[in-house]
UniProtKB/Swiss-Prot annotation:
Residues that, per the record, bind GTP: 19-27, 38-44, 67-71, 125-128, 155-157
Molecular function terms, GO-annotated: GTP binding; GTPase activity
Main location: membrane
Tissues where this protein is expressed: Expressed in root tips.
Originating species: Arabidopsis thaliana (Mouse-ear cress)
Alphabetical list of CDD domains matching this protein: Rab11_like
Lipid moiety-binding region (S-geranylgeranyl cysteine): C214, C215
One GO location term (cellular component): cell plate
Entry protein name: Ras-related protein RABA2c
Compartments reported by the entry: Endosome membrane; Golgi apparatus, trans-Golgi network membrane
Chaperone is among the record's keywords: no
SUPFAM superfamilies cross-referenced by the UniProt entry: P-loop containing nucleoside triphosphate hydrolases (SSF52540)
Amino acid sequence: MTHRVDQEYDYLFKIVLIGDSGVGKSNILSRFTRNEFCLESKSTIGVEFATRTTQVEGKTIKAQIWDTAGQERYRAITSAYYRGAVGALLVYDITKRQTFDNVLRWLRELRDHADSNIVIMMAGNKSDLNHLRSVAEEDGQSLAEKEGLSFLETSALEATNVEKAFQTILGEIYHIISKKALAAQEAAAANSAIPGQGTTINVDDTSGGAKRACCSS
């Protein structure tokens, strides 16, 4: 979802949070949008979203962050919300190996439903629980590189790298949008320079000295 608006913000970007239930997606959302953390947060039911407006290279970007439930029974519901997303944060819990093992399944589902140009970052969350770690940071980095994703370890509790993760995603999206806009402008300029394109005004002399304007394209 990329809308151009001239009042409150320049662009609206839809970003989805995906990953297994319990990896901390809701707290990542609340940390980024409200700078809050809830120790007793419950599992998301269905889909929730929140927004935050931020600056990217002088442009005002409104980030619309969708928190998609990780439970199996909501998968059919959440798949519909991939449509229109231009960014995704794929989250696993560094203390639970199974959530990391499921990353490829989430990635496959995302790529099946989302736009092929979607910007994806993988985040190993709960880095504050390093003493309980079951997924090495190198494993996360290696998988991300293999799949062509950005990667960070985050802590919603300590607010570590949460801001950086979203700013990186938003920055990459903005660069893609800017390149597309520039390419479109260059294509339009090239087309206008080609003879025979557009509207031509022909002025013909008539026998009475009057002039007639004929439009042809």
